[in-house]
Amino acid sequence: MYISKSFIPILKNNPSEAKIKSHQLMLRVGMIKQSSAGIYSWLPLGFKVMKKIEQIVREEQNKIGAQEILMPTIQPSDIWKESGRYDDYGDEMLRIKDRQGREMLYGPTNEELVTDIFRSSVKSYKSLPQLLYHIQWKFRDEVRPRFGIMRGREFYMKDAYSFDVNDEDATFSYNKFFFSYLKTFKRLELSAIPMAADTGPIGGNLSHEFIILADTGESKIFTDKRVFDLGSEGTVLDRQSLQDLRKKYEQYYAVADEKFNKNEFEEKVSEENRLITKGIEVGHIFYFGDKYSKALNAAVDLPGGKKDFVKMGSYGIGVSRLVGAIIEAKYDQKDEIMKWPFSVAPYELAIIPMINKNDTSALDKANKLFKHFESKNIDTIIDDMDENLSSKIKKFNLIGVPYQIILGKNSEDNLLEFKEIGKDPKSLTLDQITQILTEQKLKN
């Protein structure tokens, strides 16, 4: 792929309307374009990053046995009236009518729809548990959309739902998603803290939100610093191991402002371990028992001829928001270097030849290298623009391509100038470079 053939509308400067660095960078390097307030078109660069994030989310959901479905964005109002949330949801819900005058809505969430799907098909406890998820666009009519895709009205989200026969099994399902989210964010190189949270309009009595630290975050958080030393290593998918993992995190104080209790914070956390800062919510999980199954009559047959309403949970990750969250965590605004995790970078390698109309040897060499790396499944782009090498390197630092090969006029035959973003270049052989890149792919 030549950059001259790519649709990457880069701006020279940060747009004045953007207030936080993720919004600034995404507009500047042509990842998104605003369509209307809080609604964006995703251009090739941004869409590519988002799809890579989506795939990591999908893989981690599949690993815990969740099954992917796809529900529509437009939902009938009937099931929302049946659950009692049609009027309760307020002005955030976009209500519409079709040509027959039927009341419809643009889905802000999917508890009602997935419960309707479940109740039409599953009748016996023998079919449980069921873990279903989808990745789809949502719309919530925010009063004041801001910060680009971080607080937009339309957003891309992974929603999962669990259906179990009793509270014990439902807790097991909840803990599976708790574990899955920790693994997902680790693969995205984000330090996400699971925090006790209010259930809000979703309902229920158990909830955690996953927060990453960021100065631009809208959530004020209060936590014990020692929570950052924890991880999910050694955890396996059995009841005790997953319960132990959750308890390990819950032993440390970590809450957002709506759950904050000053006396409890000071009692449980020593002064040297107290951290009060801001963060961005990137995931939220809920257990709400039979709130929706009872309202929508989603019951299964039990042994002995009895029936009972299934126990449910819901589990969300903001896929589009994660694009902005990674930028907030990884973008060095001072030096204009974006350090995407290798697994989600828009390109994995940039080949940067010096362009000379009278000497095509550097471009010819770039083309040969492109074919080599293409055969190794390395996502590569060639900068064939007539610009100086310094400008090209700055451009790829801003876009966030993690590795670069620079072909200047003094390039040696057997050695290549190889540069990791933000570091000094090295002279390496093609085999050495190939090994570095293939090892990076294997890590992810």
Swiss-Prot record:
An annotated GO BP: prolyl-tRNA aminoacylation
Intracellular or extracellular location(s): Cytoplasm
The enzyme's E.C. designation: 6.1.1.15
Top-rank taxon: Bacteria
Reaction catalysed by this enzyme: tRNA(Pro) + L-proline + ATP = L-prolyl-tRNA(Pro) + AMP + diphosphate
UniProt keyword Lipoprotein, yes or no: no
Keyword flag Isomerase: no
InterPro entries: aa-tRNA-synt_IIb, aa-tRNA-synth_II, aa-tRNA-synth_II/BPL/LPL, Anticodon-bd, Anticodon-bd_dom_sf, Pro-tRNA-ligase_IIa, Pro-tRNA-synth_IIa_bac-type, Pro-tRNA_synthetase
Listed Pfam families: HGTP_anticodon, tRNA-synt_2b
Keywords: Aminoacyl-tRNA synthetase, ATP-binding, Cytoplasm, Ligase, Nucleotide-binding, Protein biosynthesis
Any one GO CC term of the record: cytosol
Disulfide bond entries: none
Family as reported in the entry's similarity comment: Belongs to the class-II aminoacyl-tRNA synthetase family. ProS type 2 subfamily.
Protein task: Catalyzes the attachment of proline to tRNA(Pro) in a two-step reaction: proline is first activated by ATP to form Pro-AMP and then transferred to the acceptor end of tRNA(Pro).
UniProt cross-references to PANTHER family, sorted A to Z: MITOCHONDRIAL RIBOSOME PROTEIN L39/PROLYL-TRNA LIGASE FAMILY MEMBER, PROLINE--TRNA LIGASE
Subunit structure: Homodimer.
Stored NCBIfam families: PRK12325.1, proS_fam_II
Protein name as annotated: Proline--tRNA ligase
Gene that specifies this protein: proS
